[in-house]
């Protein structure tokens, strides 16, 4: 995981060089004139989706909804997704429910976009457009590198969609800022985190939730 984190600055620099692709996807969104954006993702990719939701709503003024894959996978219900943009975020691009959701959204009239690490994955192939994050092979379960790069390309997309020059310039500084973060002394933070964990554990014992959490 530490090695993959150290790979983030150069990977971000490579990602920022793909501005033409991001601009083309932003142009397709603009031409689609969507009424709503639907975002699909699980785990850490779902957290990236929350980040992208705030960008869409605060920067572009577009309403965003979170996808519920079980509507398609369990209840077998298709939705009217005309005038919608459907964005699926996935590191592996192989979760069956995300693939089914993307296929259903595309069939139902949405402009479908995959923010994905593996461009040959089923999720990428199910979508009309793909934004590759270029994280490469990851071994750490946390997938920190692809999560960070997915957030970076999310920022790029919104900057291009809204023609936000100030945001674009801030994003250009990220490789340098990430590199600087790797040189910082994080020992004080580790001590604070350790103390916070102890306080949390004692709080669980005090209010009686510890045994329940372990059950």
Task: For the regions a language model picked out, list residue spans one by one.
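An N-terminal, well-structured beta->alpha segment
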Residues: 1-35, 183
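Alpha-helix boundary recognition
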Residues: 6, 30, 57, 193-194
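Short, glycine/acidic-enriched capping/hinge loops at junctions between secondary-structure elements
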Residues: 16-17, 48-52, 213-215
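Glycine-rich phosphate-binding loops that contact phosphosugars or nucleotide phosphates
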Residues: 21-22, 30-174, 180
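Generic recognition of flexible, low-complexity loop/linker segments
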Residues: 25-27, 75, 188-191
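Short, surface-exposed connector motifs at secondary-structure boundaries
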Residues: 33-37, 195-200
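Acidic catalytic cores of enzymes that act on phosphate-bearing nucleotides/polynucleotides
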Residues: 61, 196-215
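Active-site/ligand-binding-proximal alpha/beta "capping" segment
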Residues: 171-194
């Amino acid at each position: 995981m530490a090695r993959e984190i150290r790979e983030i600055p150069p990977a971000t620099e490579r990602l920022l060089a793909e501005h033409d692709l991001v601009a083309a996807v932003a142009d397709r969104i603009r031409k689609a004139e969507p009424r709503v954006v639907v975002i699909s993702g699980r785990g850490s990719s779902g957290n990236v989706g929350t980040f992208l939701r705030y960008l869409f709503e605060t920067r572009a003024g577009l309403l965003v909804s979170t996808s519920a894959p079980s509507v398609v996978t369990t209840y077998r219900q298709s939705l009217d997704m005309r005038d919608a943009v459907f964005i699926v975020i996935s590191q592996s691009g192989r979760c069956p429910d995300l693939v089914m959701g993307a296929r259903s959204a595309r069939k139902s009239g949405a402009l479908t976009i995959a923010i994905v690490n593996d461009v040959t994955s089923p999720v990428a192939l199910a979508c009309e457009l793909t934004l590759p994050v270029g994280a490469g092979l990851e071994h750490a379960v946390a997938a920190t590198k692809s999560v960070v790069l997915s957030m970076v390309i999310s920022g790029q997309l919104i900057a291009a969609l809204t023609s936000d020059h100030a945001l674009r310039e801030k994003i250009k500084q990220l490789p340098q800022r990430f590199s600087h973060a790797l040189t910082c002394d994080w020992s004080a933070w580790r001590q604070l985190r350790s103390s916070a964990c102890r306080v949390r554990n004692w709080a669980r014992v005090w209010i009686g939730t510890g045994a329940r959490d372990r059950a």
